[in-house]
Amino acid sequence: VEEKEKVRLKTLLKGGRHEVTSRLDVPLYKRDGYKIPEDEVLLKNQNKVYLGNSLYHNIRYTYQYRNRLFWGFTAEKDAGEPFGSYGNKAYDAYSFHFLLKDCGKLKALALGDYRLGFGEGLVVNSDFSLGKSTLFNMGDTRPSIKKFSSTSETSFFRGIAAAFRFGRVDMSAFYSYLPTDATLRKDGTISSLKTDGLHRTLLELSKKHNVTEQSVGTD
């Protein structure tokens, strides 16, 4: 096994690359949902009237030192979502990630938002995809902990995950606490999960973070 070179803490924190990116989408047409209604109309058409403007905007900050240290945050507002109102603190969705890799016996430590792959993805896999390398990677049973920096509001864990190596033995553990959108029945049970991440109308906002997914595991 190739040992990673030792890196001083100061180099890890200051020797990497900072990057800030932003995206703004300005539509050239206007949907009926953006027309400003009276309060009575808004209440009667809770799923037809958008509460925010028609702009889409996100901003990202990332820091990376080689393949050893990553951190950053993402903030996003979808078109039609309110900005700084209706319970939103400015943007509708926020994400933070921190990932440290190959630090002695600690192979990976993730804080904030992350993705997992255990048991070739048959046990846990929040990072599944099909591609040219899928068959070549099937023999790799080592657990994977990856940073999550996407604007997607689903298919990730939020909390802490760590992987250690003691000789030829790998050990991993994780805990996640993730608020999730859902449609609830009158008795409080879940009717369905909402996975599109959109909170543009009163009805969509009423489904925001109604339930919490807690996950814990070891490998």
Task: Say what each PLM segment does.
Residues V1-D219:
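Outer-membrane beta-barrel channel domains
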